[in-house]
Amino acid sequence: FAANEAVVGALAQSLREAPPRFIVTCARGSSDHAAAYAKYAFETQLGMATASASPSVSSVYAAEQRWQGALFLAISQSGKSPDLLRTAEAAKVAGARVVALVNVADSPLAALADTVIPLHAGAERSVAATKSYIAALAAVLHLCARWSGEAELNAALPALPGALRDGWDVDWSNLSEGLVGAHNLFVVGRGYGLGIALEAALKFKETCGLHAEAFSSAEVKHGPMALVGPDFPVLCFGQDDDTLAGTLAVA
């Protein structure tokens, strides 16, 4: 957080002085799952409507967007995805303010953006972009805390690195026993946990070759639950907030 405090603080002050009409996120893969987390952070802490832009709308359909006065938040590990760049360019033309959360600081996306928040995750050498995903979550929370000025959220930021270390030190191996022999998996979360569930499902696909699908605990009952039978594994992410009871009820 210290490395980005100056840029995030200045951006937050500017956004408070001239609030955007709404927020548009744009990302692919793991970064899009970080954007799903950002939606809940911005909407719950700032009351700011946040929507995800499909890059294909600009890169394939070349459709003109009405984003005047919007905050366009692009999240990317490499900052080189052609369709993401095309959408960011379209956002600038449409009058949006472009902010990039990007791991490669000298990338084309960084050069295009009005403001760059570096992720500082280091080089991603594996296909599964875990470091930059976690760094993107932290950057989103940093911006949200400074922008909102919410005292409890700002006070909690310094404890986050320690909490991550504690999570890393936990022995999670017992959870893998339920996946032995599995061919399919549901990963369930809600609210802030939905973006985490989406990313976990992707990681199971990428690293384990396991067919995993993520659902909101509010949506999984509307059709997908029909697939669940005896010995069908379901992994639930239940954070300690008002969504917990509903997620546990699904479990």
Per-segment meaning from a language model:
Residues 18-162, 190, 225, 230-231, ...:
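Glycine-rich phosphate-binding loops that contact phosphosugars or nucleotide phosphates
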Residues 12, 173-176, 225:
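Short hydrophobic/charged patches on amphipathic alpha-helices used for structural packing
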Residues 157-178, 187:
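Active-site/ligand-binding-proximal alpha/beta "capping" segment
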Residues 7-9, 152-157, 175-176, 215:
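Flexible, glycine/charged-enriched surface loops at secondary-structure junctions
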Residues 180-246:
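Acidic catalytic cores of enzymes that act on phosphate-bearing nucleotides/polynucleotides
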Residues 69-72, 176-183:
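Bateman (tandem CBS) regulatory domains
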Residues 5-9, 51-58, 98-99, 167-170, ...:
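Short gly/ser/thr-rich secondary-structure transition/capping motifs
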